[in-house]
From Swiss-Prot:
Subunit field text: Component of the fork protection complex (FPC) consisting of TOF1 and CSM3.
Family: Belongs to the CSM3 family.
Protein name: Chromosome segregation in meiosis protein 3
Listed PANTHER family: TIMELESS INTERACTING-RELATED, TIMELESS-INTERACTING PROTEIN
GO biological process, one term: replication fork processing
Organism: Pyricularia oryzae (strain 70-15 / ATCC MYA-4617 / FGSC 8958) (Rice blast fungus)
Compartments where found: Nucleus
Example of a GO MF term: DNA binding
UniProt main location, coarse: nucleus
Residues in coiled coil: none
A Pfam family of this chain: Swi3
């Protein structure tokens, strides 16, 4: 009996089984640290649950990202080593075939520029890069650099002295030229002067050779000289020139022997040299009159045709009448008696010279 009474729990021990804390039954209450909890668990709870429960009051530090500089295709990049200087070096390797290979040459030229722009500015497409290069090419810095490149390609105007230094203070001495050269060389100089490339608006030649590509493909437009009927002023000037050549008195040159026959007269000298005589002058005047009459009649016919297009028969009859009148007015070539007298004088002079011998 004594052992059973000792094993029964006491009443106060049963009452202490349920804790007296009112927050025990509160589901939203934060857990409290029990006294039997280990120190490591207490420290972990402090690290995981800062003050305030949610960590809103803490200051968040955000590291700023380094900004990469934006690369632009401007005049500075064009003047760099990968810009136009590299393009000038690569231009020596470009070979074009010329006429008959226009398509392949154009494709080769486009690929040449595309590879250069891909190395210079790979970020942009080919057409966009070309637009950027064109925009940057209008800057003052690019104009100055272009002028310097062109001046570098020009030959030096001053020749170096014996010491190896160029004479800057004195102008270059021009080479003496003969006053008379052969006609074939005159023609060649005229052709060379007409085919020389003209300078651009800034007074400098083109950096890439001007119209060399146009001459290679024979597509350079050439100015065509207008071919039309000569004006009345030209005809009058031609007639006046022929008359003045006849009216000029020709000097009579004496023979070497003094009293012998005179040398050829001015008229004979002109005839020997191919100068126009009276017959040639008459022919020129007749041709000019025919041309003037035909030109005037054609102009009148055009005006008449514009005003009254139904008078074709009248125009034909008028044209026939004008042609007959011109044929009647044309002077016949007259043989002067001067030729006979001059030949007679020549014979007498020859006989006189024979008598002197």
């Amino acid at each position: 009996m004594s052992t059973s009474k000792a094993k029964q729990p006491s009443v106060p021990a049963l009452d202490n089984y349920i804790p007296d804390d009112e927050d025990f039954f509160d589901p939203f209450a934060s857990p409290t640290n029990s006294p039997n909890q280990s120190p490591k668990a207490k420290g972990g709870a402090k690290r995981s649950e800062p003050d305030g429960g949610l960590g809103i009051d803490e200051e968040v530090s955000v590291a700023k990202r380094a900004r990469v500089p934006r690369v632009k295709l401007d005049e500075t990049r064009l003047l760099s080593d990968k810009g136009i200087p590299a393009l000038r070096k690569r231009a020596g390797t470009l070979r074009l075939k010329g006429k008959g290979h226009e398509f392949s040459d154009a494709a080769r030229l486009l690929s040449f520029y595309q590879l250069w722009l891909d190395d210079l500015f790979p970020k942009a497409k080919f057409l966009d890069a070309l637009a950027m290069v064109e925009k940057a090419g209008h800057k003052t810095t690019m104009h100055k650099a272009r002028t310097d490149w062109i001046n570098d390609l020009k030959p030096n105007m001053t020749a170096p002295d014996n010491d190896g230094h160029a004479d800057i203070g004195h102008a270059p001495v021009a080479q003496p030229q003969s006053s008379r050269i052969a006609p074939i060389f005159e023609k060649r100089q005229t052709i060379d002067a007409s085919t020389m490339p003209a300078e651009d608006s800034n007074g400098v030649d083109d950096l890439f050779g001007g119209d060399d590509l146009g001459e290679m493909y024979d597509v350079t437009p050439k100015a065509t000289r207008p071919v039309g009927e000569p004006d009345d002023d030209d005809i009058e000037a031609l007639m006046a020139e022929a008359e003045s050549s006849i009216r000029q008195p020709a000097p009579i040159a004496m023979s070497l022997f003094g009293s012998g026959r005179p040398a050829k007269t001015g008229t004979e000298a002109q005839r020997a040299n191919g100068s126009p005589n009276d017959e040639d002058l008459d022919a020129v005047m007749a041709e000019a009159e025919v041309h003037t009459v035909s030109h005037g009649s054609s102009t009148a016919r055009k005006q008449r045709a514009q005003t009254d297009p139904g008078n074709d028969d009248d125009d034909l009859e008028a044209l026939i009448a004008e042609a007959e009148g011109v044929l009647k007015q044309k002077p016949a070539p007259s043989h002067k008696t001067k030729d006979k007298t001059s030949s007679f004088d020549d014979e007498e002079a020859a006989m006189a010279e024979l008598d002197l011998w």
